Amino acid sequence: MSGLIAYCRQGFEPELAAELRDRAVLLGIAGDIYAQRNHGFVLLRCDPLHVDTLLQQLHWRRLIFARQTLRLHAELKTLNSRDRIAPILAALPKTPCFGDLWIEYPDSDMGKPLAGLARSFGNALRPVLRSAGRLSAQLHPQWPRLHVCFLSGDHVLLGSTRSVDSAPWQLGIPRLKLLPEAPSRSALKLEEALITLLTPNEREAKLRPGMQATDLGAAPGGWTWVLIRQHLRVTSIDNAALRPPLLNHPLVQHVRADGFRWTPPRPMDWMVCDMVEQPRRVAERMAVWLREGWCRHMIFNLKLPMKKRWDETRLCLERFETQAAVPLTLRAKQLYHDREEITVYASNDAR
């Protein structure tokens, strides 16, 4: 068996399946998709000769609805609860030696009850793999990482990935803590966007103290709060009030105005937007900001409809890129802290 394992948000398996299928077709690769709603993962089975290409072109950063992508090695069913280890050892590829081991389960109603089993099984499997020469004695991030994903007590997927090409969090979920002073839980969305959609080098270069930013539809102020923690100066646009600790903050200027109509008096370094509005309207307005040179970098959310969410996502991003009419770096992801939405990062490469 060969192909890809991709984790996703529960309920978005059809969207991830459609995304994988469309992108595989663009690569000229045929494959079989397995996706069941609310299972929290999708399988793409294909010819072994195509797996490397898929992993390079469809790794987690390039896919919108995938939290993690793995090389699929085997699917083991009807495992005996008295000895799950022997079949797993037998099913592993002859090479390589793995540098790390993650025991996982889908982030779904079906998978979450398996968390206890995953913890205990990892403690049992790890020394056996080391004794067999299949797992390094010390952590080796440069070596492939083995993933054992429990779908039930007797059903397991075996996968692997290179640490440099994969999400750095188990299940593809960053564990962020909401600080008590945060004005709203939406702050977690922007925090996750910054660590997911930008590389460490990009964050260092593009989020420098003193930069100017605009937050459209800012109230109650979660995204503004994240930006000022990066020491950016923020103009917060909203007719509604901001919450403490933003009131009278030296880095915050609150302008009571409509975020869709307000225009900046001078070009900004950043613009962020988490307004609840039709996704096409948001995409079109965001494109205006880049086309007019009102900002260099932006992060915004697109609230998705209940049906045809992949089609709407693709249409909105295509319209945005076309109407922006500038050279772009464009990335999008359904984040763990997103709901029925995706988060988009765009940067004007010409400035």
Swiss-Prot record:
Binding, S-adenosyl-L-methionine: 186, 219-222, 238, 258, 274
The reaction(s) this protein catalyses: cytidine(2498) in 23S rRNA + S-adenosyl-L-methionine = 2'-O-methylcytidine(2498) in 23S rRNA + S-adenosyl-L-homocysteine + H(+)
GO molecular function, one term: S-adenosylmethionine-dependent methyltransferase activity
Key word Cytoplasm present: yes
Superkingdom field: Bacteria
UniProt record, GO biological process: methylation; rRNA processing
Gene Ontology cellular component annotations, sorted alphabetically: cytoplasm
Keywords of this entry: Cytoplasm, Methyltransferase, rRNA processing, S-adenosyl-L-methionine, Transferase
Keyword Membrane annotated: no
Active site (UniProt): 303 (proton acceptor)
Location relative to the cell: Cytoplasm
Enzyme class: transferase
Enzyme Commission number: 2.1.1.186
PANTHER family on file: RIBOSOMAL RNA LARGE SUBUNIT METHYLTRANSFERASE M (PTHR37524), RIBOSOMAL RNA METHYLTRANSFERASE FTSJ DOMAIN-CONTAINING PROTEIN (PTHR37524:SF2)
Subunit structure: Monomer.
Function text: Catalyzes the 2'-O-methylation at nucleotide C2498 in 23S rRNA.
Family indicated by similarity: Belongs to the class I-like SAM-binding methyltransferase superfamily. RNA methyltransferase RlmE family. RlmM subfamily.
The protein, known as: Ribosomal RNA large subunit methyltransferase M
